[in-house]
């Protein structure tokens, strides 16, 4: 019972050893005694939590970085998921939850197993066949019931390469999130996008999924056999500034690009913006992956929380009223946002607090 608990590693004296402080089931520290000798068993199995990642974005150096032939251009530039800003995506597949830390593994939490159980790696689940081992984002195509992985690792022979392809879109067989092998008897497959250097993010809209690269916008629509999905390039001049910088409301998909705001509602259109210079002349591009879009549908608003140039954390917002076609901005730190619907009022998070918005008359509702 002493060892069969969750522990935090205290020290790592060598590459192959670590220490922790033993405790009883009440949390009280315990020490070894004579009766412990010979009672430890011949081996100990440990299950480890995944690395928490970083709280800042690190700009990679290497291929495509800087000017042609200078500095580290042409060298390996990949950063591991553990050594990069930790961003999560998740989506429901039926009653189960599929989750993915950007650039890391893909996990599934099974609702029937109860809240006391943890999510497990999808590729190691019994019955899994050629499930991607890494990805940039996961989405479930709700109407046709396919699991989609943006930025998956490709299939090489009879296995996955375990090396992320930032432009590869992989999708499972219909109604089966464990089957990713493309066969004539199923609808699994993959498509590699061509415009851009990496997929930045994707959102689900009406009857389609909008996928953004760093330079372009694609529409992904279910078309059935033999192709399953059609991926159409719809714009090449408006990449997404960060994975969370797009949001869907009743009038379209709104997103922040580099130096401008756009809306997609059948075609991509640049939004006239009276505060454009204020926002983009004082924004921390190096932490753009922290930018996140939000909706406040009751007030016909879409907006973005972003870090100013002097901050590595979110400290500002800009809002667009989709009915009145006006912009407004301010200073506020919010790192997550849930619009009303499931809850009565919008909920937002920052600095260990959850705030309820659009209620009361002060800034601490």
Regions inferred by a protein language model and the residue ranges of each:
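Beta-sheet-dominated scaffold domains
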Residues: 194-365
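Hydrophobic or amphipathic alpha-helical targeting/insertion segments
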Residues: 95-118
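Short, conserved, GDST-rich strand-edge loop motifs in beta-rich repeat architectures
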Residues: 152-170, 198, 307-309
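Small/polar beta-strand repeat architecture
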Residues: 2-86, 114-120, 124-130
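Secondary-structure transition/turn motif
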Residues: 21-29, 102, 110-112, 306-308, ...
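Surface-exposed loop and turn segments in beta-propeller and other repeat-based domains
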Residues: 51-77, 125-128, 174-195, 274-287
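Beta-propeller blade signature
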Residues: 162-175, 316-322
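Structural signature of eukaryotic scaffold interfaces centered on beta-propeller domains
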Residues: 60-62, 66-94, 129-145, 192-205, ...
